[in-house]
Regions:
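C-terminal accessory domains and tails appended to enzymatic cores
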Residues: 3-6, 10-120
């Protein structure tokens, strides 16, 4: 049975803001902006009717590139965030537990960061 070495998943509407930055996989979209526009254009329903999801998605990729390293020069000009879903190829892994673990780690990181700020 053939399986890919890695499986990544992206979240379109929220952009994985509930995943710790060090657990995000950075997908560099910089070299092919024309490809990103063409892929977005395939979904006409997302472009017509007054909502320009194509422009919003492009703007998010640009913002991700800038905000990915807040204290360093930009490495990318366009960036998508993904998460590693490879462990889910093992059918014994419960998807809800797998995702909840990401949320739990994010929650712990937020509490730790806030705690450090108040101890000063």
């Amino acid at each position: 049975e053939e399986r890919p070495e890695k499986v990544y998943g992206c979240e379109v509407w929220r952009d994985l803001d509930w995943v710790c930055d060090d657990e995000k996989v950075y997908l560099d979209c910089s070299p092919h902006p024309n490809l990103m526009r063409c892929l977005s254009a395939v979904f006409d329903s997302q472009i017509v009717g007054g909502k320009r999801y194509d422009l919003a998605a492009e703007g998010r990729r640009l913002a991700n590139a800038t905000f990915s390293a807040s204290h360093a020069c930009d490495t990318y000009s366009a960036l998508n965030y993904a998460m590693d879903l490879t462990p889910l190829m093992d059918q014994s892994v419960d998807i809800a537990d797998y995702i909840a673990a990401y949320i739990d780690r994010f929650k712990a990181q937020v509490k730790e960061t806030i705690g450090r700020s108040y101890r000063k």
